[in-house]
């Protein structure tokens, strides 16, 4: 199963988009990717089983590093179709992706 998706290849329609930035990083930012729901990565066990099993799940953190990697590992281990955006929200913006106020 693929682990990542390039920002320029991502089409948001039909995807379940999750912001997994750490709380401190999310609080320091005024923006998010449209349609994203924030889930605290430190509470993964509390919300992982609530995710839809019939949709592709796309995650992002700040730069597509350790946070996204760890969450994708955990979700894929549960059989979910999860990937993360290469470069995180910063890569998304650099590729011309839209952001909105959170």
Give, region by region, the residue ranges found by the protein language model.
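Rhodanese-like catalytic fold shared by cysteine-dependent sulfurtransferases
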Residues: 1-16, 20-58, 63-102
């Amino acid at each position: 199963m693929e682990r990542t998706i390039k920002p320029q290849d991502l089409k948001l329609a039909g995807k379940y988009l999750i912001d997994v930035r750490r709380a401190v990083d999310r609080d320091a930012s005024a923006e998010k990717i449209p349609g994203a729901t924030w889930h605290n990565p430190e509470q993964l066990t509390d919300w992982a089983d609530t995710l839809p099993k019939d949709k592709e799940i796309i995650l992002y953190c700040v730069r597509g590093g350790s946070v996204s990697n760890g969450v994708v590992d955990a979700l894929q281990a549960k059989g979910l179709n999860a990937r993360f955006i290469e470069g995180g929200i910063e890569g998304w913006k650099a590729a011309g992706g839209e952001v909105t106020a959170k």
